[in-house]
Amino acid sequence: MTIMRKSHPLFKIVNHAFIDLPTPPNISGWWNFGSLLGMCLILQILTGLFLAMHYTSDTLTAFSSVTHICRDVNFGWLIRYMHANGASLFFICLYIHIGRGIYYGSYLYKETWNIGILLLFLTMATAFVGYVLPWGQMSFWGATVITNLLSAIPYIGQDLVEWIWGGFSVDKATLTRFFAFHFILPFIIAALAMXHLLFLHETGSNNPLGIPSDSDKIPFHPYYSTKDFLGAIMLIMLFMTLVLYFPDKLGDPDNYTPANXLNTPPHIKPEWYFLFAYAILRSIPNKLGGVVALILSILVLALLPYLHTSNQRSLLFRPLSQFLFWTLVSDLLLLTWIGGQPVEPPFIIIGQMASILYFSIIXIFMPLAGLIENKMLKW
């Protein structure tokens, strides 16, 4: 008689994905972030569900309902701060996961990579509409500024913005629909994540060497299940330290002031995880040009499989490309800092130079470095 997990139609799927999955024997800690992202998503859905039980999506009561959650609901303060900081944790894991994909050439699995880019867009959309819900000053003005960018689209722009707002400004209709979007999107993300895994398991995981490991695979359980569990425990410890000791460290103090359409905050800026894209948006003086650059800053990732010129998959043995990769990371950190600064010299020119460097490294320097390395190795 066969084991139930190998014969039962439902358990068989789980078995092939998480138990008997053939896995490369040498994947490092950088491969932990996929499972950590799954954990983050579950955490966000659960905390979000409990918050939705007490939240009201009305302009008059939204702010006070969040205050009520923090003051009157049992452990409401904990649920709220876990959800707010859980978004930061999600994006930290997401950016490391993408960085690992670039470093080790995982983008050559095109279907998995493209679904990943779609997941990134959806996660960013979810985080944006979620940030509007507490209805503080930065929520209101962030929603106004970012949705207004769509008015740069020729001919239909203004109509599109008013259609999204549900009126002539960000108001009750906007808040209600943003709450609806914020509730449904994580489930769409979960469905896409399953498709992401499905395509990954079609090809098998990549590994740090970037070479096929078909002849030398080990089962996922107990080796990598234990490793993922250890990673999850470590991340939860760091996360709970942030939530319990520094819950407002990553937030904006302006969001503790109720939304007021008559009073503009001195510096309108998004959460830290959007600052790099915001800096790229602001670096172009033209509105439409800025919007295009903003979208391209993420969409440029889709070009990576087609710009791969090296005969090696991974950057592990390619010092020139490694230098460019870490320059790219530094550049993104610089853009993140610039995004939080006011629009004045010298920040304007630094932001513009960093934006040019960002696109140049991905689209010009990295493909060139691959060709140079091939030449040096006489390939």
From Swiss-Prot:
Binding site for heme b b562: 83, 182
Residues spanning the membrane: 33-53, 77-98, 113-133, 178-198, 226-246, 288-308, 320-340, 347-367
Binding site for a ubiquinone: 201
SUPFAM superfamilies: a domain/subunit of cytochrome bc1 complex (Ubiquinol-cytochrome c reductase), Transmembrane di-heme cytochromes
Cofactor: heme b
Binding residues for heme b b566: 97, 196
Record's bilayer topology term: Multi-pass membrane protein
Keyword annotations of the record: Electron transport, Heme, Iron, Membrane, Metal-binding, Mitochondrion, Mitochondrion inner membrane, Respiratory chain, Transmembrane, Transmembrane helix, Transport, Ubiquinone
Cofactor info, note text: Binds 2 heme b groups non-covalently.
Miscellaneous field: Heme 1 (or BL or b562) is low-potential and absorbs at about 562 nm, and heme 2 (or BH or b566) is high-potential and absorbs at about 566 nm.
Record's subunit section: The cytochrome bc1 complex contains 11 subunits: 3 respiratory subunits (MT-CYB, CYC1 and UQCRFS1), 2 core proteins (UQCRC1 and UQCRC2) and 6 low-molecular weight proteins (UQCRH/QCR6, UQCRB/QCR7, UQCRQ/QCR8, UQCR10/QCR9, UQCR11/QCR10 and a cleavage product of UQCRFS1). This cytochrome bc1 complex then forms a dimer.
Record-stated family: Belongs to the cytochrome b family.
Function description: Component of the ubiquinol-cytochrome c reductase complex (complex III or cytochrome b-c1 complex) that is part of the mitochondrial respiratory chain. The b-c1 complex mediates electron transfer from ubiquinol to cytochrome c. Contributes to the generation of a proton gradient across the mitochondrial membrane that is then used for ATP synthesis.
Protein name: Cytochrome b
